Amino acid sequence: MQARYSVSDPNALGVVPYLSEQNYYRAAGSYGGMASPMGVYSGHPEQYGAGMGRSYAPYHHQPAAPKDLVKPPYSYIALITMAIQNAPEKKITLNGIYQFIMDRFPFYRENKQGWQNSIRHNLSLNECFVKVPRDDKKPGKGSYWTLDPDSYNMFENGSFLRRRRRFKKKDVPKDKEERAHLKEPPSTTAKGAPTGTPVADGPKEAEKKVVVKSEAASPALPVITKVETLSPEGALQASPRSASSTPAGSPDGSLPEHHAAAPNGLPGFSVETIMTLRTSPPGGDLSPAAARAGLVVPPLALPYAAAPPAAYTQPCAQGLEAAGSAGYQCSMRAMSLYTGAERPAHVCVPPALDEALSDHPSGPGSPLGALNLAAGQEGALGASGHHHQHHGHLHPQAPPPAPQPPPAPQPATQATSWYLNHGGDLSHLPGHTFATQQQTFPNVREMFNSHRLGLDNSSLGESQVSNASCQLPYRATPSLYRHAAPYSYDCTKY
């Protein structure tokens, strides 16, 4: 330590002068200086130990005194009531009240004259405390104090922090009369109840007749109710049954559901239709992404109607004709933002509507064709006839085994390559199912044909005829919640 910190300049460092001065005075002896302070304490251990024990023994409550000197939140009436109720015979002398308060609350161990005077005032001025004379047999002085029997409930819920009201003797008869009035009405109604029951049977029978007729008059409901006999016993037994069947079987509860599904021209939206679409898809070409979309997206389908996709997919068709491949990809990307919420409506399209849509080769020119384009982009309707119809603008007469078309210009593919870099990872997201390859495609047709032909174990068809670069690195069951790329997001979350 002396080598590092020089003794000549003790003010060189802010913390060191104390150490350097110590070393300066101890420089003559090596470490003998350390033994002398230890000897001071070790030579007289009994003196300090005994002194500490004796000094703290009589004042064992003093360390907690600063915390306990806060005045308790109880009134003097509450303190007196506590003392009386804790007494064995529910009566206690004035000195007993003082002792109880001092034992329970250290705050009252000081200034005894002030608070004890307040205790005496409260005992004499409040009518809830009754003075009981002392028996001559028991030694001692001072009378006992007890609580008036009618004042036991003067505190709310047994809490001494709040009193209901000031107890007065003249209020006791009024309270007793009120209690008597409260007890009488149940007995009178119980006596009058048997006389009123035959009168009440008539309305119950009428209600039962109305319920049975309304259920039978609705032809669209398959609910069959059992008609009971209209005897008083039968009416009483059948009324719970009819009351419980009205929410489920009456036209008020179930007909609005059918009418709500009717304006869209779609079948009733339910879990059964989704499960049947998932288990038996049309044509058997439903890709895993589409099957997953049918299960993930449905809660978002209810607030939207079937008409809005036509308004959003018209710009997609114009971008397809005007801007070529790059504009088409961008517009399809933008359209996936709008059609992400309406998608389940396309998943539930009935087969009759599919056939009607497949007869119109115009594609996005009509609203129905635009609706089907959005459904085809989703990948839920994966038949080959539909996807040929969607891309009629690029290949009007393309047979299924199409030869390799001329490749698109390089700038277009480079500009759109950042959409397609993580295609294999994006294939599990419903909004980006069209970008399924990790390499850039030579043309737009292969990019949109490859993912619709079933990516599991089925043949890839046209997309593999063209070149060997279309070997899809598709994972069989990608996890639903995996984040694929920094720019990817799931439209169903918003």
Curated annotation (Swiss-Prot):
Residues where Asymmetric dimethylarginine is found: R452
List modified residues, type Omega-N-methylarginine.
Answer: R278, R292
The cross-link Glycyl lysine isopeptide (Lys-Gly) (interchain with G-Cter in SUMO2) sits at: K183, K213
Q: Where in the cell is it found?
A: Nucleus
Segments of skewed composition (Basic and acidic residues): 170-184, 202-212
* InterPro entries, sorted: Fork_head_dom, FOX_domain-containing, FOXC1/C2-like_FH, TF_fork_head_CS_1, TF_fork_head_CS_2, WH-like_DNA-bd_sf, WH_DNA-bd_sf
Classification via PROSITE patterns: FORK_HEAD_1, FORK_HEAD_2, FORK_HEAD_3
Expression by tissue, per the entry, reads: Expressed in the brain, muscle, heart, fat, kidney, lung, liver, uterus, ovary and testis.
* Keywords (A to Z) from UniProt: Activator, Developmental protein, DNA-binding, Isopeptide bond, Methylation, Nucleus, Phosphoprotein, Transcription, Transcription regulation, Ubl conjugation
PTM field:
Phosphorylation regulates FOXC2 transcriptional activity by promoting its recruitment to chromatin.
Which residues are recorded with the post-translational modification Phosphoserine?
S214, S218, S231, S239, S250, S280, S287, S366
- Ranges of biased composition (kind: Basic residues): 385-394
Q: Name one GO molecular function term.
A: DNA-binding transcription factor activity, RNA polymerase II-specific
Its job: Transcriptional activator.
Q: Enumerate the PANTHER family for this protein.
A: FORKHEAD BOX PROTEIN, FORKHEAD BOX PROTEIN C2
Mind telling me what this protein is named? Forkhead box protein C2
Origin species, per record, is Mus musculus (Mouse)
Gene encoding the protein: Foxc2
